[in-house]
Amino acid sequence: MERRASETPEDGDPEEDTATALQRLVELTTSRVTPVRSLRDQYHLIRKLGSGSYGRVLLAQPHQGGPAVALKLLRRDLVLRSTFLREFCVGRCVSAHPGLLQTLAGPLQTPRYFAFAQEYAPCGDLSGMLQERGLPELLVKRVVAQLAGALDFLHSRGLVHADVKPDNVLVFDPVCSRVALGDLGLTRPEGSPTPAPPVPLPTAPPELCLLLPPDTLPLRPAVDSWGLGVLLFCAATACFPWDVALAPNPEFEAFAGWVTTKPQPPQPPPPWDQFAPPALALLQGLLDLDPETRSPPLAVLDFLGDDWGLQGNREGPGVLGSAVSYEDREEGGSSLEEWTDEGDDSKSGGRTGTDGGAP
């Protein structure tokens, strides 16, 4: 798969901040969007990988050859052109990092959709691997180490992902030798005004959950640290630690009460008691209630050599039978032989695998 040199916000004027550089890149890219009558002019459309409120993702084979790609479609009646271009440009700028899903050249527009291609992850997303129990400790460490590097790469370029969750982690092989963070639809320059989530989310940090409209907070990398901590918990347990990081949620209150009590009780509340002390220390740092003292993502690297206490999770070469590929998931149900670019998305459910959420 062709990879070009990354375009970073540092390119050009060294004094230009990330937000200004990104806006400049969006403006330059506007003229590079290719209008086509149909996506079939350039791709053989194989099957639907997922869908969401703003579009869908299709498995497609370029007519010009090369590997299959995940073709992301965003509905033009629901997504601003600038929103589409921003996601595409951010993706192109950070594609050099293996922990971030590669966005390919050549943005398109049809009468109904904006579209761009991304690399295809054969094993789907991380949420599909998490069934009744969490991953083996080795795989949990592989996942969070790769994501920590990806987030540090974003943060070093003045960007915050702002949507770290299992659904947005794409898996390339059953043992997680490579995973990549996708869905850059909510990625913004650090300092961008950020409101509370439109609906309660288990991955949102308490400082955002506490906001009331129309209040906002400047977007900070600490938001991604919190998301990484929640994702670590999910990968280890196959469930979220709470429905929302806000009182009166009982699970969050139990955790918050434990970490804020001085001196801290030696025994954490369930389900945190399943983690060994090094993993607890890592989780407490990433899930620090104060964003000013929250650990950066790369703190993960200091704990990789420690025992995390996850020996009870599935072990052995056959433990990931649930890590089915997109082909296995879609078998017999999502042929695109009859689909057209004017297809009706209103009946689609689920998520897109790389869907950007609200514009």
Curated annotation (Swiss-Prot):
UniProt catalytic activity: L-seryl-[protein] + ATP = O-phospho-L-seryl-[protein] + ADP + H(+); L-threonyl-[protein] + ATP = O-phospho-L-threonyl-[protein] + ADP + H(+)
Keyword Amino-acid biosynthesis: no
Claim: ATP-binding is one of the keywords in the record: yes
UniProt-annotated stretches for the region Disordered: 314-359
Keywords: ATP-binding, Kinase, Nucleotide-binding, Serine/threonine-protein kinase, Transferase
Entry binding sites for ATP: 49-57, 72
Name under which the protein is recorded: Uncharacterized serine/threonine-protein kinase SBK3
Gene: SBK3
